């Protein structure tokens, strides 16, 4: 299908040329963010305009994008948390022999060291890190389920070929850097 290859090539050529002005104007008219960008991309890729959104619902685009953004945010939090733990560990080591007073129930208790107290703070962050890594390792895309969770738009696109439909979510997950979809 020469036509298909031309359409794909045209989209690849313009994949990073986001025409925000056209999308913004179109959104004023249709009040739909995804379809406004589909329209703007279609203006840049006239050969591909008819296939840009083929099979994909707006929920497919928006919901999966939200998961991708959340995943990127979790990566940033993870990096910062690891750095905080490393700095607290250095602080604890530096002050491991500096005496201070420990508290329990906001009442003075017994002598300890600043370093020991810092290890307790660090432990809290280590538990947070463990939880964060669990969330990151189990995060999944929503996949191609669409608005109603049935993949109806893709079933229609592929003439009800369930075998093909079953291959879509693993492909989407792999392409987006995830292990799987729901």
Model feature map: region roles:
Residues 1-2, 175-182:
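Short, intrinsically disordered, charge-balanced linker/junction segments flanking boundaries
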Residues 157-159:
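Short coil/turn connectors between adjacent alpha-helices in alpha-solenoid helical repeat scaffolds
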């Amino acid at each position: 299908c020469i036509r298909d290859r031309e359409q794909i090539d045209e989209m690849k050529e313009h994949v990073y040329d986001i025409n925000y002005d056209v999308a913004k104007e179109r959104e004023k008219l249709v009040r739909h963010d995804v379809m406004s960008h589909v329209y703007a991309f279609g203006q840049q890729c006239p050969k591909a305009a008819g296939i840009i959104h083929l099979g994909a619902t707006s929920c497919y685009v928006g919901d999966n994008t939200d998961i991708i953004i959340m995943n990127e945010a979790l990566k940033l939090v993870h990096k910062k948390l690891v750095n905080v733990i490393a700095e607290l560990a250095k602080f604890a080591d530096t002050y491991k022999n500096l005496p201070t007073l420990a508290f329990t129930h906001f009442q003075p208790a017994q002598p300890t060291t600043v370093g020991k107290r810092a290890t307790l703070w660090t432990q809290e962050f280590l538990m947070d890190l463990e939880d964060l890594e669990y969330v990151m390792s189990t995060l999944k895309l929503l996949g191609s389920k669409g608005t109603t969770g049935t993949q109806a738009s893709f079933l229609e696109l592929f003439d009800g070929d369930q075998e093909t439909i079953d291959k879509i979510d693993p492909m989407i997950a792999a392409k987006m850097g995830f292990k799987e979809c729901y």
